[in-house]
Structure formats: C-alpha cells, structure tokens
Design a protein with these regions (language model features):
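Acidic, metal/ion-coordinating pockets
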Residues: 1-203
Length: 203
C-alpha cells in the first residue's frame, strides 16, 4: 500500500515501506511523537500501535524491535491492536537515561466489539491500568495492572440482539447465560494462556 502524498496528515505510519516488506521502521515519525509528548511534560507516555499479523497471538521480531525502541526513548506503556486476538502482556524493567523504570506492553487487546468468530477472537478483555504520582518527586509510575475477561457472544441471526459484549464473571453469575458457562471458562483459560500472565482481575 502506497500512501498518496496529500495523506501525510491523516496517519502516523509505523513503516516507510508499506508497499513492500514492512521492514523499514519509520523511526523519525515515532520518535518525533514521543518527543512531542515529552515537550508537554506528560506524566505518562502511552503509545497505541496498530501492528502485527491478523489472528497471530505471539508478536514478531519487528514488533519487539519497535517496542524496545519506544521504551528506550521514554514510552511508559504500549497498547497494541490489529490482530483481533488478545496477545501477551508483560511488565518490564528498563533503564532510560541511567534510571530504572517499570514499563508495560499489551501486544494486542483483541476485539472490543466485533462479529468475528475466527480463532479465539471472541475471548477478549478490558485492560485496567493504574498510575500513582509521588507527591514529593512528582514522578508518575505504574502502580497496578489487571484485565477484566470479556466474551463477545453471537446469539444467532434470529436473536433480538445478535452480538453482546459480556463481562465474563458477572455473566457467569447470571442465570440468563447459564448455557454459556463452559464457553466462559474456556475464554478465561484462553486469555490467561494468550497473555502469558496472571493479570486476570478475578485472580
């Protein structure tokens, strides 16, 4: 895909070579955005990236390379999308400008509302991130991370409501969704496996 010249203000692209190999990272644009946030004295810098391969759960080498670059340049949190599947979530300790800090990445948050049923894409989540500012230093840091398991139910073509976004644990407590209990349990297990974490808020 080659972007027309007059589309330069409509998107911030990850790569300079969208029409070929997706290997030339658009470092200048990415780092300019990070610098702009720093210049505003942002308490937290969060990068939201549309990346990865559809229905692939594990990140590829290029995603890891981009994540490392962003973290080393001051980004605190990376939230990914595009694959339609919830991907790995992890906290890291990085050293930036000689100081250690905790950063977080969610490679893909999956779908929030969708009619897709491919793979395990109906098992999704809502991410909860908490930040705390030190009253003395003014430094802001990640203080809590969890996710709420969610399931996108397809009730069929004849249903009054075809698709529903169901917070799994509250839905499990309702008799209205008793027949979905095995599906909910499987979704919880899938999310734990896909994220490679114990960040489920129900743990």
């Amino acid at each position: 895909m080659t972007l027309p010249a007059d589309a330069r203000y409509s998107v911030d692209v990850l790569f300079n070579d969208y029409d070929s190999t997706y290997s030339d990272i658009n470092k200048a644009s990415l780092l300019a955005s990070v610098k702009a946030a720093k210049d505003l004295n942002a308490d937290v810098i969060i990068a939201m990236l549309h990346w990865g391969v559809e229905y692939e759960i594990q990140p590829d080498e290029m995603q890891n390379k981009i994540a490392d670059m962003l973290f080393q340049n001051g980004v605190d949190v990376i939230l990914g999308s595009h694959s339609h599947e919830v991907g790995p979530m992890e906290k890291r300790t990085v050293t930036v400008d000689g100081e250690e800090k905790t950063v977080f990445i969610a490679y893909s948050l999956g779908n929030f509302f969708s009619s897709m049923t491919e793979g395990t894409s109906q098992a999704t989540c809502i991410l909860n991130l908490e930040f705390t500012m030190d009253a003395e230093t003014g430094e802001t840091a990640i203080s809590d991370i969890s996710y709420q398991p969610v399931y996108i139910a397809d009730n069929g073509e004849g249903a009054a409501t075809r698709y529903e976004v169901l917070p799994i644990r509250s839905a499990k407590a309702s008799s209205a969704f008793a027949d979905l209990t095995p599906v909910f349990n499987e979704a919880i297990a899938t999310l734990k496996k896909n994220t490679g974490s114990s960040l489920d808020s129900g743990n």
